[in-house]
């Protein structure tokens, strides 16, 4: 897993946007993105422009625009900036061995800022057991828990009945999935995050997974392009895809 700050971009199948700065609704097509693609009838076009005051109103979050998740937030101040910029999910690393790990008290402050701004606080856990995760989630007022590592994922079936869950699948550099979603309760996951720690393109290997998945999906990688994501959406016909 990556322990630095990252951003996840939720994509609707006909609207593709990558951003390093800020974002706006797609209805007026005004953007301040590093690059933008808009997919319609399987055609791809790109444009760049600038705008101001692009942070969405709370009522507009998730409507006809990308959903963004910022991860690795370490302070309430940074969380406020992320929310102001339009982030929909604020991720915090609770795992103590990360250089960006934070205390539960700081996580609670971040959660409060996120919720007040209309965003959802997410806690990242690695190799933690059920009780540890639930205690931390309660203490920090988390909306979702993100499960990395075998120990954390082993508690999924119990956790998903208590909390909203982002279930993490790992992929190697060749795009092969190294673990699977549990058959019994996998459909209960709120999000699936496909994590490629080494980056890499794994489109072909994951198309069948996307096509069969009934969950929202995050993709984590370093070599995604607008064309590649457009291709993924068109070929897999998934409802939603996200990029880290």
UniProtKB/Swiss-Prot annotation:
Pathway: Amino-acid biosynthesis; L-tryptophan biosynthesis; L-tryptophan from chorismate: step 3/5. Signal peptide: none annotated. It catalyses: N-(5-phospho-beta-D-ribosyl)anthranilate = 1-(2-carboxyphenylamino)-1-deoxy-D-ribulose 5-phosphate. InterPro entries: Aldolase_TIM, PRAI_dom, RibuloseP-bd_barrel, TrpF_fam. CDD domains: PRAI. Gene3D superfamilies: Aldolase class I. The keyword Amino-acid biosynthesis applies. GO terms for molecular function: phosphoribosylanthranilate isomerase activity. Keywords: Amino-acid biosynthesis, Aromatic amino acid biosynthesis, Chloroplast, Isomerase, Plastid, Transit peptide, Tryptophan biosynthesis. It is found in: Plastid, Chloroplast. GO terms for biological process: L-tryptophan biosynthetic process; response to UV. One of its GO terms (cellular component) is chloroplast. Its EC number is 5.3.1.24. Residues 1-32 form a transit peptide. Its main location: plastid. Belongs to the TrpF family. This is N-(5'-phosphoribosyl)anthranilate isomerase 3, chloroplastic.
